[in-house]
Each structure stands twice: as C-alpha cells, then as structure tokens.
C-alpha cells in the first residue's frame, strides 16, 4: 500500500465517503484541506427483525408455556434435537406490544420497522436502542466495531427497511454480503498483505489524525443545526481508529464465505437467500463471541417472492400474508390461512434458533440479550399493534424467563402497551438510567418500564 495514501482514498477504503466533510458542511464551512467487571463477561445486545407479521393462533404458547405443540411457529426454539439444546427456558414471549409512536403518525405496516428500536415515527431524531447502547451509553467503546448492522436481501435505507438509526434520524446502511462482513471482521485492513500490515496502519493513522483536525475545526464553526451530523462523523472516525489499532482476533477465524452471484431479494437473489442468511448469522455470532463487537442488528428481508427456499408458498406476500384471516371473539377465522403464514414464521424462528445455537456453542449466550420483533401483528391489516416480540435473555440479566406475558387489555384485548416501555426496560438492563425512550407528541407513550419482565 502506498505511504502517500490520501484522506479520500483512506476513508473510501473503510467505507466512509472521502467527500463527507465538504458535503455535510456545504454552505457554511470552508473546504476541508463500558468496561466489564473483572471475571464477568461484558453484556451484549442483538436486535433481530422478523418479517411479515405472525399467525397469532400458532405463535401464542399454550398452557404450561408449551411452544412445541403441532403447528407452533416457535417450535424451533424448543428443538434440542435440531439446535443442540432447547431455548424455551431463556425465552420471554411478549404479547401485546404496540408500535404506538409510529401509529400516532402513520409510520405503520411495512414502515413499522422504523419504530421497533427507536420508539419513534418516521421523523424521529433519536438513536435506535442498539446505537444508544453502543455509542451514547458506551458499551461499544472497547471493541473494534462499535456495532454491526447486518441484513439479508436488502441494503436499502428506506424508512421501513432499517432497524438501526443514528442520532439525528440517520439510517445506518446494512452489510448484506457475507464476504464483506468476513473481510471487515477477520480480513487484513485496507486489503494489505500481512507484511504490509503495520505500514498500512501507520499510514492510516496519519491520515486519520489530519481528518480529525479538519473535523475539529469545522465543528467549532458549525451552526448548532449541523452539530449532530458532525458528531456522527466523529463517531465513525473513532470506529475507524479502533479498527486500525486492533490486533487480529485471538479466537479462530471461520472459513471465508463464498462469493454469491446475487445478493438482493426481488432482483434474482432469492435462490441464495437461505445460504446467505445462515452465513450472516454465523458471522454475527462469531463477532459477538470474539468480542469484535457487543452490539448488533440483523434485518431479515421481507419474504415475498418464490424460490427463496423450498418449503415456502409461491408468494408469501399477496397469497399468504394478505389472506391471513385471524380468529377473534367475534370471528372464527380461517385455519388454513394460519397454517400458510405459519410456514414463513416457523422458518424465521428457525433462523433465530440458529443464532442462539451459535452463541451458546461459543459460550456467549449467557451474557447476550436478543430482542426479536416484527413490524406487524396482523399482516392482512398491516397492523402495527400486537407485533410479535420475543426476548431471549442470558442468565446474566436476571429476568424471569421461560414464560408468556400477555400485556393486552381493553375491549376484546385489542390494546397493548407502547414498545417504548420495553426499550426503556432493555436500556435499564444495560445500566442506562433512562425513564423514557423515543419521540412522540403524545409524551405519555414514551415513559415507564415493564416491571413484569423480572417476574
């Protein structure tokens, strides 16, 4: 690698636009020349998006917290034969979580993933829970990657296609290519050969020092309205610096993943969807267990086209989700529609079980909290009420797991609790003393916690 590496080339090689300083400050600036206790494992957080609603009749546990009955979509989480152990006793099934702040402003249905970890509608400016924990609360400060933002099938940053949002309301791009994820986690920085590694680090740090100086000067001149963007850039630079300073992982690197002909769903990537999903899960679990990061999100793309995997119906979207006919107090529903939607749900929870299996095999599950949620409850109605929400808690968090919590209330149990309260509770589990989370003109939605999580 050339020792005369420019700032622009350096930042581009690390996935940061070399023009970002000028772009974000155009019009007002000159052109730019948590520590774990001794002996205790650090706490980790993973957020997982589960797509396309749920067949509530087959998602809800039965008496005795039975999640393995015939047809249950949660059965993979209690399948020791397939996944090495049952995760039933680590599980909290939360029925009655509403994406209330989104409902208030119409950020619902397929846009609802915007609300899952932010507790805010489309115009919210707060960070999502993962970024709050990693950046603002600081649990990502000691790892090479402050956080990981992974996806399968879509790298879009549209409102309804992202879980992770930086402060200021900026969506964080997802890494959807396992080969890139592997290179970022286990590859040689900047593509240098092993003998060039130290010179590459020195050159990178030299450029980084100059960019940091540019950023400091711009920040002093910036109007208040631009400070949040500059803070985001400063966070990105700190992450780059950590990665340059970090030595190779002490745990064994997995085998490099293959290159896939196509990566995106809806554009021909469907035949590879299952293999890509498994690789992303395995790399995520390895990153957590190697302490390369302590915070991550995984966005599983909407399963709406044929040929993604053999057991799915031809069109999960129009022919399955939109034809789901729920049972309620005044309507018996259509069991055949539940069974069809349950195929997709069962597949998704099988992938969640794979993630838990990999974390358990690496000894990282006890110190990890996994939050898995979707953007819709009843997909036929595009309803963001009673979204399927699971917490899988390691033993270090002190939650009373292995049970079902029905948080629904009101007429026909049609009302739930705002997901903001769950976000407050999770933040508290990581030692963040917050009493509210998210943004809404209806501030009553934002405050409070779910004391029932502890039993």
Predicted feature descriptions by range:
Residues 2-455:
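Ligand-binding pockets and gating/stacking loops
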